[in-house]
């Protein structure tokens, strides 16, 4: 069931912080603080600086978000 009061945005990881928090730079230039979603934590998805991610940002607090997906990396 999707939440209605979130905005889905793309960005990349700038910095890994303690407690599974990350600093994310969005494609529109804003920097936010984001944490890993429970499903990613449960499945041991590793996120490193430089990874492309999909972030859900609440419309009530545009400085915090939840990382819901790590984009696949093309190995060229």
Curated annotation (Swiss-Prot):
Residue ranges occupied by any S1-like domain in the UniProt entry: 1-72
Cellular component per GO, a single term: cytosol
Entry-linked PROSITE patterns: S1_IF1_TYPE
GO molecular function list: ribosome binding; rRNA binding; translation initiation factor activity
InterPro entries: NA-bd_OB-fold (IPR012340), RNA-binding_domain_S1_IF1 (IPR006196), S1_domain (IPR003029), TIF_IF1 (IPR004368)
Pfam families listed in its UniProt record: eIF-1a
Localisation: Cytoplasm
The entry's keywords: Cytoplasm, Initiation factor, Protein biosynthesis, RNA-binding, rRNA-binding
Family according to the record: Belongs to the IF-1 family.
Cross-referenced HAMAP family: IF_1
General function of this protein: One of the essential components for the initiation of protein synthesis. Stabilizes the binding of IF-2 and IF-3 on the 30S subunit to which N-formylmethionyl-tRNA(fMet) subsequently binds. Helps modulate mRNA selection, yielding the 30S pre-initiation complex (PIC). Upon addition of the 50S ribosomal subunit IF-1, IF-2 and IF-3 are released leaving the mature 70S translation initiation complex.
Subunit architecture: Component of the 30S ribosomal translation pre-initiation complex which assembles on the 30S ribosome in the order IF-2 and IF-3, IF-1 and N-formylmethionyl-tRNA(fMet); mRNA recruitment can occur at any time during PIC assembly.
Protein name: Translation initiation factor IF-1
